[in-house]
A protein has these predicted regions:
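A short alpha-helical cap/connector motif
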Residues: 1-176, 180-240
Length: 240
């Protein structure tokens, strides 16, 4: 256990000092953010604009993550799998907020898809999830009774296609980005989410340290934003 904790500390220290991939460090990301947290529990308890009832679902989410991770069928590379904090955040917020419409970009092996769908299945509103990916095999990432809508994007015409698909949908309550983490796509998607979200809606982004897009847009276009550590990267949460 001690060696495991030490390894996590070293990874997080490296993120503090150097950033990840293209060198987007925590110092750059933190400018203008409303708070930086080690996990979902401390975030929810500290921030008044996030639903306190989400804390009631954290243990449930963590147990479910272990189950989903073991049982989930591999359809793409495992390195694209979401990690525990993102899974927990999504499950807890979807349970607490009872959203009607959720958008997810990037399905991979369906870890986040299952977090959202298993929460929606239990909610009174029986909300719907619209998931977008360029890989046809990811359409098999979720099998269940909930209202899941998979949208296959053409990799040669992704920008135009996703805009066309989104404009057909109602306003969005929660938007989850976990697809292309390059600067151009992240900036495009964050702005599309901003336009599509209801007032008070939530944008959640994995890998905000992959480009400078989050640092630029979260402070200038959203009302509040927060950062959570995951074991290898940062998660961003922004409120419209």
């Amino acid at each position: 256990m001690r060696d495991s904790l030490l390894a996590i500390f070293k990874k997080r220290l490296n993120l503090f000092l150097k950033g990840d991939r293209d060198g987007v460090s925590l110092g750059s990301l933190s400018t203008g953010t409303s708070g930086i947290y080690l996990n979902v529990d401390t975030l929810i308890k500290a921030e008044s604009e996030l639903p306190k009832t989400a804390c009631n679902f954290i243990n449930e989410a963590e147990n479910l993550f272990e189950s989903v991770s073991i049982k989930q069928q591999q359809v793409t590379n495992l390195r694209w799998n979401a990690e525990k904090q993102l899974f927990t955040l999504l499950y807890a917020l979807v349970k607490a907020n009872n959203p009607k419409v959720v958008i997810e970009t990037g399905v991979a092996n369906g870890i986040t898809t299952n977090a959202i769908m298993k929460a929606l299945e239990l909610n009174e509103s029986k909300g719907e999830l619209h998931s977008f990916d360029v890989l046809p095999e990811t359409s098999k990432a979720y099998i269940g009774s909930g209202n899941w809508n998979f949208h296959l994007l053409n990799s040669k015409n992704t920008y135009k296609q996703i805009v066309n698909e989104i404009t057909k949908l109602p306003k969005v309550d929660i938007w989850v980005h976990d697809s292309d983490h390059g600067y151009r796509w992240q900036k495009f998607e964050y702005l599309l989410a901003l336009k599509s979200l209801n007032t008070g809606g939530i944008l959640i982004s994995d890998d905000i340290d992959a480009s400078s897009a989050w640092a630029e847009l979260s402070r200038s276009h959203f009302r509040k934003s927060y950062i959570i550590f995951d074991s290898r990267k940062f998660i961003g949460i922004a409120l419209k």
